[in-house]
């Protein structure tokens, strides 16, 4: 089975313009993501709508493909890039361009989901632990996932799910395993083509989570579990935290 990685990278981020080109430990963020992915998948490309990002990727020797400026999601950008670089792959892996610390184990966990021939789409979750605290569980920027016994996602929400009746909220993390969604997706190539043609759904619009469009239309999402905590970069403050984390790791 052949896997291709696509790393969507936009220049015009509302909260952090030019984020892919921000320097982290002497390298652009997008370069760090690309280097983490290279060698684990059969091939990897950055998909961008901006010539400055294209130039930066070429400068460090990466592969890049230009895509439309009109895409509403990274999934749409992934599909356009896939159609441009060739279709000889079984699975397309969508790697967030703001995850410079994505780990090999996480990519391998997503790949393993496709050992089940019934898997259409796969993603990752990380268990919340009691030490994370209630504030982390309540964070609407960390979507929660309810997972079935077959390891398929039942629902994603920015709210805390499930609600534990007759249990004080402060004790929820001790009495149940909650899962935080990690924004790494993989799709069988034919499924990717299908889901990019779907109109936005009511649940997707309500929660602002595109994966609900797929669930609402009957697609299944297989879930892999990761114990690794990643540091996504959405704001300049996140970049500062990532810089501190990198220095600490390199000093160990």
UniProtKB/Swiss-Prot annotation:
It catalyses: 3-deoxy-alpha-D-manno-oct-2-ulosonate + CTP = CMP-3-deoxy-beta-D-manno-octulosonate + diphosphate. Its EC number is 2.7.7.38. GO terms for cellular component: cytosol. It is an enzyme of class 2 (transferase). Activates KDO (a required 8-carbon sugar) for incorporation into bacterial lipopolysaccharide in Gram-negative bacteria. GO terms for biological process: CMP-keto-3-deoxy-D-manno-octulosonic acid biosynthetic process; lipopolysaccharide biosynthetic process. Belongs to the KdsB family. The keyword Cytoplasm applies. Coiled coil: none annotated. Pathway: Nucleotide-sugar biosynthesis; CMP-3-deoxy-D-manno-octulosonate biosynthesis; CMP-3-deoxy-D-manno-octulosonate from 3-deoxy-D-manno-octulosonate and CTP: step 1/1; Bacterial outer membrane biogenesis; lipopolysaccharide biosynthesis. This is 3-deoxy-manno-octulosonate cytidylyltransferase. It is found in: Cytoplasm. Pfam families: CTP_transf_3. Keywords: Cytoplasm, Lipopolysaccharide biosynthesis, Nucleotidyltransferase, Transferase. The keyword Nucleus does not apply. The lineage of its organism: Bacteria, Pseudomonadati, Bacteroidota, Bacteroidia, Bacteroidales. It comes from the Bacteria.
């Amino acid at each position: 089975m052949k896997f291709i990685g696509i790393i969507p990278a936009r220049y015009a981020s509302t909260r952090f313009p030019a984020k892919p080109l921000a320097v982290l430990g002497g390298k652009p963020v997008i370069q760090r993501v690309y280097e983490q992915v290279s060698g684990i998948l059969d091939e990897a490309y950055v998909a961008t709508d901006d010539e400055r990002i294209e130039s930066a990727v070429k400068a460090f020797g990466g592969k890049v493909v230009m895509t439309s400026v009109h895409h509403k999601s990274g999934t749409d950008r992934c599909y356009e890039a896939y159609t441009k670089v060739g279709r000889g792959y079984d699975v397309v892996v969508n790697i967030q361009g703001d995850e410079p610390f994505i780990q090999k184990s996480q990519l391998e966990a997503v790949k393993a989901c496709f050992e089940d021939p019934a898997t259409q789409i796969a993603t990752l979750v990380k268990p919340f632990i009691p030490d994370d605290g209630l504030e982390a569980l309540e964070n609407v920027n960390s979507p929660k996932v309810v997972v079935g016994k077959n390891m398929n996602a039942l629902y994603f929400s920015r709210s805390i799910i499930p609600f534990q009746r007759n249990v004080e909220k402060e004790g929820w993390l001790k009495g149940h395993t909650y899962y935080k969604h990690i924004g790494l997706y993989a799709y069988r190539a034919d499924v990717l083509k299908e889901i990019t043609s779907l109109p936005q759904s009511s649940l997707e619009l309500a929660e602002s989570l595109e994966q609900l469009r797929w669930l609402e239309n009957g697609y299944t999402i297989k879930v892999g579990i990761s114990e690794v905590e990643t540091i996504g970069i959405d704001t300049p403050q996140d970049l500062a935290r990532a810089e501190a984390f990198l220095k600490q790791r390199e000093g160990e």
